[in-house]
């Protein structure tokens, strides 16, 4: 009898131990899930607040009495570009986290959708700039490859169904390959869409630690001119007339980038020809006037909050609009958080 009671007691204790252990495990899982949920919600709130602060800095940039009208300049020495490490707005501390933010001027990139005019013809300054860009480091595509892919880029962008020369490719060409996306015959919706164009070399899209990929240098959100105050050296060199040796063009671009970084030169960056009138050594270099801008209104925000060890990200492209003294921001593109 005593043995039976002992066995029953041990069984009861075993059941209780298992029950308590499982209950504690479930409580720990629920606590961890709750912590993740709270950290994620806080991270998203931090990112949205950061977006509002960047918009405020961009608005203040236009309200500056010395920075209005056609003489306005936008460059990476301004508070909006330095966010969150700027001194115009005091940010509250994040005791259990951190905020990383990058604000990129989209108008400092090549406006890929400006390659073709509304009537389906090449925009020659844009065409030549893209040829220069793809034919120079870090891409260095040979002339034969450029002669093949440039008509196919045009056919992807223009609205007609007529192939551009012997190397053109319209919908009929893409239909020959099973599973291939057909020719859009319209503006690119996202930069990566270039990879769908027939015979586009994949290597030009690859980014490394020491060089950009093509997707870092082009924008589907802008049209027309390029902000020479924020364009990367690869873009600046590509804007130089092809009659100028490419090595000279790259040296010119590097000199431009160094000049505009110097705070002593910020006041000159509102001049469209500052690279000729203010920067020594390159008076013979003239960038296409229709491609030159010194201000911008479209910005990409890449925000990442790390709260309690949980990271949340937010990517959005904003367009700054000024109407009757009122500054507003419209989302051009937004990725899911």
Where is each model-derived feature located?
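Compositionally biased linear targeting/interaction segments
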Residues: 4-337
